A protein has these predicted regions:
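Aromatic-acidic/polar surface patches that form glycan- and anion
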Residues: 11, 52, 399
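Bacterial N-terminal signal peptides that target proteins for export
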Residues: 1-13
């Protein structure tokens, strides 16, 4: 059945009213009913008009039906959603509640952490509200940023003798416009000198990455060796690109395509004839140079749009890749059509527009086919790069969700896939946004992806073939910009794909640019400040 959406003003106003009435279950009576009132005790869900309590209820009751591990959740009376009210800010109460919901699944547990591994909730009224939280990076699904533009830092040496480098910069950001790139050494931020007391600067570095500093003066040395003093960076809104850089590198008589990608932003043109102004030129260039081997740099890529991941798979895949690409598997409640709470959610497309049938009926998420057959996706080759044989992925603990899906789904269809870096995040599950109180989007893990061989379940992360263990010379060397063949991870990847005299042996490079002696410290905050946005699905098939 063809999905249609309407942009007329009158119907749009009606849709807004419907979202308000349905999206957050805001009624004076108890709504929705528990999953199975005859079995589970539900005496504590009394009628209320309190908006926070209604949203508390909705968050739990949606999880009871759509959470991938919904069978682990207790009854309403045992969980008591309305007890999450101790914080002044409602969003913090809902985050606390969601965190406690996910504690019932061992897959969501992060030892010692006060946040869920996968689930999150955001306030859409906040600036860049569709981002997860301060613990995630600052580009939204359409590559709009609101920050200084620094992805993260890397620190090499000991706590008393170390150097700090910018590890990534978003294109067109304030940092990029000031000439700061990956490879820029930072020696001072404001009055805080950097290099001799690591513990004393962690708070300042984190403040930059968390947007707690709205403006700051930076001093240091640019990647080309040019010193700079008191360059002011101020948080601003900007249009960026998810592609850090791409190039063709010639080594050992072979052209290797290199591509550094920050997130799976929504396609510039989606639907049945997709295209993307950021990705298409990259792979056209690879095709024109006869590339058969790729290095795909996902070390700072925490996921994004599933549709974009599928499109990228179709750009990468050789012409021999046909048939099934992957499946999305939902829980039994959803597959059997028993997730009746989804009647409260108007079905939207990737841009948030409500979808209607050809007869004008507004679709809800209850109209979606959640079966395995309805959520199986197939190869449909895109672009002119048709002969890819070998791929090396550069990865880290911030490589998650759609990034891991890309790796898992291409494996059965090329000759060789190798990973260089540190273990990935481990997130084979995804979600779609649930609107609550016409204000909050809850992202509750609802499906798991499996490749064409039925492989998946990498909850513990993917372990690299060439592991950066801090001792073997393989290092995320932020002294070099993306695409520089001397950078540690890329140097290792090139030695795998196009070995020359120095080569690699047992996961070692013969030489890596020197870093200060001692332990290599990496500044982290809540998952390494990589934009762990998840694996977001916005395409759905209507039940027949």
């Amino acid at each position: 059945m063809k999905l249609l959406f309407w942009s007329g003003k009158s119907k749009f106003l009606i849709a807004l009213l419907l979202i308000t009435a349905l999206g957050a279950c805001k009624k004076s009576k108890v709504n929705p009913d528990p999953v199975d009132p005859a079995v589970e005790s539900n005496t504590k869900q009394t009628p209320t008009t309190n908006r926070r309590e209604l949203t508390n209820d909705s968050l739990f009751l949606y999880a009871k039906q759509i959470y991938f591990w919904n069978t682990t959740l207790p009854s309403y009376d045992v969980f008591e959603p309305r007890k999450y009210k101790t914080y002044p800010l409602d969003l913090d109460n809902f985050r606390d509640e969601l965190f406690n919901i996910t504690k019932y699944s061992t897959f969501e547990t992060v030892p010692g952490a006060n946040y869920s591994k996968y689930a999150y909730i955001v306030d859409n009224t906040e600036s860049n509200g569709n981002q997860a939280s301060a613990k995630f990076a600052s580009l939204d699904a359409n590559d709009v940023g609101y920050d200084m533009g620094i992805v993260t830092f890397r620190n090499y040496g000991t706590e008393t003798n170390y150097t700090t480098y910018v590890a990534g910069v978003y294109p067109n950001s304030p940092a990029a416009n000031a000439g700061i790139t990956r490879g820029t050494q930072i020696t001072k931020i404001g009055n805080v000198s950097i290099g001799t007391n690591f513990n004393s600067v962690v708070q300042t570095l984190n403040a930059v990455l968390n947007n707690r500093l709205t403006t700051a003066l930076f001093s240091g040395i640019k990647a080309d060796g040019t010193p700079f003093t008191d360059v002011r960076l101020t948080i601003a809104r900007y249009n960026s690109s998810s592609v850090f850089t791409s190039k063709v590198i010639t080594q050992g008589g072979k052209n290797v395509g290199y591509f550094a990608y920050s997130r799976f932003s929504v396609l510039t043109v989606g639907g049945k004839t997709p295209s993307d102004v950021r990705l298409d030129p990259v792979f056209a260039e690879f095709a024109s140079k006869g590339v058969t081997d790729l290095v795909i740099d996902l070390r700072y890529n925490g996921g994004g749009s599933v549709e974009t991941a599928e499109y990228l798979l179709n750009l990468i895949a050789p012409s021999t890749a046909t048939g099934k690409m992957y499946q999305e598997l939902y829980n039994n409640t959803m597959k059997t059509g028993k997730a009746t709470i989804l009647e409260k959610q108007p079905l939207t497309d990737g841009s948030g527009k409500i979808l209607y049938s050809s007869s004008g009926k507004m679709y809800t998420y209850d109209d979606v086919d959640w079966t395995e057959a309805g959520n199986t996706y197939y190869f449909s080759k895109k672009g002119s790069l048709t002969g890819v044989k070998n791929i090396v992925f550069l990865v880290s603990g911030g490589t998650a969700s759609a990034s891991e899906m890309l790796i898992n789904c291409i494996k059965p269809h090329v000759q060789s896939v190798k990973l260089v870096g540190t273990k990935t995040y481990g997130k084979p599950v995804g979600f779609f946004p649930i609107l609550l109180d016409n204000r909050y989007n809850a992202y509750i893990p609802s499906f798991e992806t499996r490749n064409s061989r039925g492989e998946g379940g990498y909850y513990a992360g993917m372990t690299p073939d060439y592991l950066d263990d801090g001792n073997n010379g393989i290092v995320d060397d932020a002294k070099y910009d993306f695409g520089n063949p001397n950078e540690g991870y890329l140097k290792t990847a090139l030695s795998i794909l196009a070995p020359v005299a120095q080569g690699v042996s047992s996961g070692r490079t013969s030489s890596v640019a020197s870093t200060p002696a001692g332990n290599i410290k990496t500044l982290t905050f809540a998952n390494d400040n990589i934009e762990n946005v998840g694996m977001i699905e916005t395409r759905f098939k209507i039940k027949k």
